[in-house]
Swiss-Prot record:
Keywords: Endoplasmic reticulum, Golgi apparatus, Membrane, Signal-anchor, Transmembrane, Transmembrane helix. One of its GO terms (cellular component) is endoplasmic reticulum. It comes from Schizosaccharomyces pombe (strain 972 / ATCC 24843) (Fission yeast). Residues 1-8 are cytoplasmic. One of its GO terms (biological process) is cell wall mannoprotein biosynthetic process. The chain crosses the membrane at residues 9-29. Residues 30-337 are lumenal. This is Mannan polymerase complex subunit mnn9.
Length: 337
């Protein structure tokens, strides 16, 4: 009788455990960890299978354990950039980092500084480490010794931004994993963002979404990134008379386009969650669903509808049927040279 009762109790406990497990899997949303199955064959070799249908890109990325890839082309290392990156409160076990630095004398210095910063984190407590970090070194001709004024000269833009587009594509295609849900492009000179940057942008659940980038000059806020805009009839007419290899640029007196610039419509005390449709974007703080890049939306290195690099990317994403948006009252801050 005692044996019978013991067996009955064990059976009931197993039944309850199975019931709890069933309910858990029934009501728990599918997460990216379910998208990968690792199989080892008899020869000791292993391979991985990813069910891409289970990769979620949702408005609640933490709950759904969605992996984020933060990508930064880096010609100069700003400690404030790294400090701000470490203050992001998205779970680090869901964050992978990708950097690309120039293979030059200046690049070697940047590489050392970046590695030192990474090592301090990755050799620390396990719960403070990033899931994965990759540094690429490549010839890019993007000099870290140029001043901000030199980098933004009108005459230098087509060549400079074409090279930057190639650099971005190399970084993206070398680091994007099958399990990645979101790609956050974060420029190396962005030194201040809300700690909830990833969650705030993902909450809108848009295909492409960019924050508004300003500089702080004392108590004064100055708009910085003019690559996020709504197209104008004037710009379209200018483009219609251009040679196929010419590009339209924004923010230059030499080429007035009269586009609506997101940076110019910022007002204090407005709702930071306000969203607007855009035709062009910058990459200072740009969140992209990984599926958009997988669809083929990259950064054109050549004039694409007379646009190049990030603005060309926005055009390409829209041509592929994806939505492109901005947050005019949600600010991130650029290093003030």
């Amino acid at each position: 009788m005692r044996v019978y009762n013991k067996s009955r109790i064990v059976g009931q406990l197993l039944f309850v455990a199975l019931g709890i497990t069933f309910i858990y899997y029934l009501f728990t949303p599918s997460v990216n960890s379910n998208a990968k199955v690792q199989i080892e064959n008899r020869g000791g070799n292993s391979y991985e299978i990813y069910d891409m249908n289970k990769i979620t890109e949702s408005s609640d990325p933490i709950r759904n354990k969605e992996e984020v890839l933060i990508l930064t082309p880096i010609a100069r290392f700003y400690p404030q950039y790294w400090k701000n990156l470490l203050e992001l409160d998205y779970p680090r076990n869901l964050i992978s980092l990708g950097f690309i630095v120039p293979s030059s004398k200046d690049g070697a210095k940047v590489h050392r500084e970046l590695r030192n910063a990474i090592n301090a984190v990755q050799k620390g407590p396990g719960d403070k480490r990033f899931a994965d970090v990759k540094i690429l070194i490549q010839d890019s001709d993007l000099s870290s010794g140029q001043s901000e004024a030199e980098r933004h000269k009108f005459s230098a833009q087509k060549e400079r931004r074409g090279k930057l587009a190639a650099t971005r594509n190399t970084l993206l295609l070398s680091t994007l994993k099958p399990s990645t849900s979101w790609v956050l492009w974060l420029d190396s000179d962005i030194v201040e963002t809300p700690s909830t940057l990833i969650q705030d942008l993902a909450e809108h659940n848009e295909d492409v979404l960019v924050a508004n980038c300003f500089q702080k000059q004392g108590d004064k806020l100055t708009p910085y990134d003019f690559n996020s805009w709504v197209d104008s009839q004037t710009a379209q007419e200018l483009a219609s008379h251009m040679d196929r290899d010419e590009i339209l640029l924004e923010g230059y007196a030499e080429l007035p386009t009269y586009r609506m610039l997101m940076a110019k419509i910022y007002e204090e005390h407005k709702d930071p969650s306000t969203i607007m449709a855009l035709d062009g974007v910058g990459t200072t703080a740009l969140l992209v669903k990984a599926s958009v890049h997988r669809d083929g939306a990259l950064f054109p290195t050549f004039p694409f509808y007379h646009l190049i690099e990030s603005e060309g990317f926005a055009k390409m994403a829209k041509r592929l049927g994806h939505g492109v948006y901005g947050l005019p009252y949600y600010l991130v801050f650029h290093h003030n040279e």
